[in-house]
Amino acid sequence: MTVRSSPGSASPATLRRSLAAFAALAATLLCGAGETSSHDVVVYGGTSGGVTAAVAAARMGQSVVLIEPGRHLGGLTSGGLGATDIGKKESIGGLSREFYQRVKRHYANPAAWKYGRPDEFRSNQHDPKEDVMFYFEPHVAEKIYVDLLREARVEVVRGERLDLKSGVAKHGTQVDAITMESGRRFRGRVFIDASYEGDLMAKAGVRYLVGRESNATFGETHNGNQPYLLRRQKVASAHDFRRAVDPYVRPGDPTSGLIFGVQPGGPGPEGEGDHRVQAYCFRLCLTNVPENRVPFTRPADYDPAKYELVARYLNSAQMLPEFPTAGDIEHPVLGNNLTRPEPVVIMPNRKSDSNNKDPVGFNLIAGNYDYPDADHATRERIVREHVSWQQGLIWFFVSDPRVPEKYRAPMKDWGYPKDEFTDTGHWPHQLYVREARRLHGALVMTQRHCDGTLPVTDSIGMGGYAMDSHNVRRYVDENGHVRTEGTIGLGVRQAYRIGYDAITPRREQCTNLLVPVCLSATHVAYGSIRMEPVFMILGHSAGVAAAQAIAQRAAVQAIDRAQLRAALLQQGQVLERPAR
């Protein structure tokens, strides 16, 4: 774990820094270096949580601007993650539930089923009797978000990225304005950082965390380095090697170096904190409808040598000792177990939501360590590397003779949908940033809050998904085999409360900023909270809190918590477990 604070942070105890920040703002204004607009609430990041934050504040009568650095709204929810990771359904309320109700209404129209019929759609998460629908196509999700923002009369600004060098102007503990790379400036009374990266939070001088804490830091059991967790439990995880794979360029020869995708170093001390971040990938939308299918093609930078690890795993016949009956390998691209003619997750209109499968799937493990604190150019490079890895993996399964025929043959029936991501070559517009920066606030949500052993006051929403982390690295074990490390799948017994102080910075650091996406949580707890329905819940609550801070002329930390609770309940938020 790394605890960080932006070098230029302003503090109420440091008059010189406060005056410097104010002077910088004044100088910039005098120079006329870009258009300036003023709003009550400024939301940075058009993620699912950013949309609900903006809509909630606008519905409370505030003037709101939503700034999205890219061209699309909805983040992962409109970027391929159509098979919602739900957790406890009963904990989803407010604008989050309204979104899924609108999905249900969309598919209630027979005209929505262009490439299939409603009775063909099957999912263990879909109950036709419910008022919500949790599986949907990406373009449908984005249209719903656009409609919500238009109806609430939120000003939406796309294609504007925060200036990471001098883009946040503070006076004391208050953010006065934020400036984009173009020079465009936005003044506000309350700011909400709803980005996956937490750039506004970091550049406002707010303390934050990156990586994994040690177990000892917050009294947890599943944080930090976990090389023996699955082996000790003998759990045949979909993300762990179950067959023996040699890691060396020349098999058996450590002097020849490691093949692509294996990191140096052995198991390491168990439970020790580090800088590592769980792996990212793109959630792909694929289809097997011929008239709507764009065939897979060979990427220009395709390098078959990068997939030697995949080839060795697919062709290994030696089971590792703790997994003697692990069964067949799931298809790393299509995600099925080869007994089905289609991916596990089928969406409306014969589309898929294809996530990482197996220890050598879509995740570019260890390719994201620099992402959380990187500048825009470095992040763009990291995104390109993820695209390259994933598109190359697809072509490897289409074309490489090292791929057994039972894995190659199904690929001919699948491709990208013509009617999705039409302005990005049918490739998702959003990388799955599973975890980046995390606020270090007065309340840090931990494993013990999620499992119910520590109480949480001032609830602003509920979580209910398992504490889930993807792998952070591959290493060579004591027997010379490749292993993965970092997977966590720690279930929660029941829905748990998320406290208001987890989305507010410490008061001495910033008093008009809310952070509902990169909220204050340990690596383990964030693994549960980081689900898209919860981001929408927390965004909604942040929007209401922002409006109340303005109405009460109070710091976001000092608003009347009883009034916040009353407003959230009136708006349909679920703040407690339903009575049995």
Residue ranges and their predicted role:
Residues 1-15:
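N-terminal secretory signal peptides that target proteins for export/translocation
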Residues 18-29:
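Bacterial N-terminal signal peptides
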Residues 62-63, 68-169, 209, 217-219:
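Conserved N-terminal/central alpha/beta ligand/cofactor-binding core
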Residues 167-185:
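Conserved beta-strand-loop-beta-strand element in the redox core of flavoprotein oxidoreductases
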Residues 50:
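N-terminal Rossmann-fold NAD(P) dinucleotide-binding loop
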Residues 142, 184-190, 194-579:
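Flavin (FAD/FMN)-binding glycine-rich loop and adjacent Rossmann-like elements that form
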Residues 37-47:
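Beta1/beta-strand and adjacent pyrophosphate-binding region of the FAD-binding site
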Residues 27-38:
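Bacterial Sec-dependent signal peptides at the C-terminal "C-region" and cleavage site
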